[in-house]
Amino acid sequence: MAEKHDVIDDIIDIRDGLGRLLNPLGGLTGSITDPAHVERFDPSDYKEKPRPNSIFCLRCSASSLVDQDVAVRTCSLCLDICPVDAIEINKASVRVKDNCRMCGLCTMVCPTESFIVQRLMARQLYDKIARAASTYERCYVTCTRALGRLPRENEVLLPCVGAVPRELWLSLIADFDNISVYLPLDICDRCRTTTGEDAYTNEIATAEKWSQASVGFEANGRGLNHEQARAYRRGQFMDDMRQAGLTALVATNSAPAGAQAIAKKIRDHADQLYDIQRSLEEAVGDKAASGHRRILTQKRKTVLGMLQLHPSLADRMRLEVPVCDVTHCTMCGICVRECPVNACDLDRQGHFSVKAAYCVNCGACATVCPENALTMEACDPRELVVRDVEAERRRRSAATQEERLKGAA
């Protein structure tokens, strides 16, 4: 249902129309007078070779704990998804060779985030897509091959759409209903990143199954919508009026300024993720029994933030965590040493436990267990719903204040 058009919208339309009349060439004037300063599209500007960190690599960790034939079975996700076999793992080291296509698929698939590409990290990518989705009627996620030009502000350009993990898709479509993938038909058939199409279809399908929401799809470049969202345009207009000193008009329409409101939304999301980590550390401890600090990956942190706002979605998720058969466990501790995020615990009494919120569900601990005492079983995803301690404190404070007011009356 369309939003009601009022006098504020009419004024905005008139202002925009006058702006186009007064400056019909827009940004073309500068390029005509000085062609050297024209920004040109270069796909390499949106690509970056991943930096591997062997400390968090599951196979590297296993190489120092078990035989090599067992170590190679712990994880091969990056090797399997790389379209040009550019990743080389040799015992305790990981190397990305020079034939890397810089597609970013290894960063998406690695459960422990062993491959670092700054622009593809979950936090940065969420902020970029969320900002575009909040500002415009539609936000498009696409790749350099599909777009072939400089992106507009509501187009998020990636080396491959498959670089977006399911955790990020889940968090985004739970919060926004205007995100689409733009890929012309058959564009992936001619791409040398041969594993990219399967990657993005699997990740999006899983996120849609868990969220019961959907990602849009656009194959026609001429059908892309670059209109700014009504709420954003109104917010920006009111901010312009505020700066111009027209306080009377602003007083009757106190909508938050568009850019400021979106910036606040992004900051609030970052603050929420920080509070979640702090709440987890207070609830289960920031260190494992071994004394090592627990690590919360960016992808997992994004999911926890989404579930805190939409706890009902937890019931649709299916995640597996290790479960210990105490009759087989010899307390050797290999499982604990294998876990790179320190989600596994083995206390002095021999009790094995796992913190589901930190566990990345890789199954490496079960693979390296010499006695096969660990098996991966479905966990209760509601364990991933982190209490919002600060919100609960505010509610208690408000309830106490209300009772005092009633008592005074």
Which residues does each PLM region occupy?
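N-terminal secretory signal peptides and thylakoid transit peptides that target proteins
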Residues: N225-T252
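C-terminal segment of N-terminal export signals and the immediately downstream linker at the start
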Residues: Y232, A251-R294
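Proteins enriched for Cys/Gly/acidic motifs involved in redox and nucleic-acid/cofactor modification
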Residues: S31-D34, T247-A257, K301
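Ferredoxin-like iron-sulfur electron-transfer modules
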Residues: H37-T74, V84-M102, L120-Y126, G223-Q228, ...
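Cys/His-rich metal-chelating microdomains
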Residues: C60-S63, C78-I81, D85, C103-I116, ...
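Short, cationic motifs built from Arg/Lys/His that form the positively charged side of catalytic pockets
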Residues: C100, C106, R233-G235
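Flanking helices and flexible, charged tails adjoining ferredoxin-like Fe-S electron-transfer domains
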Residues: M1-E48, I55, S64-V70, L105-H226, ...
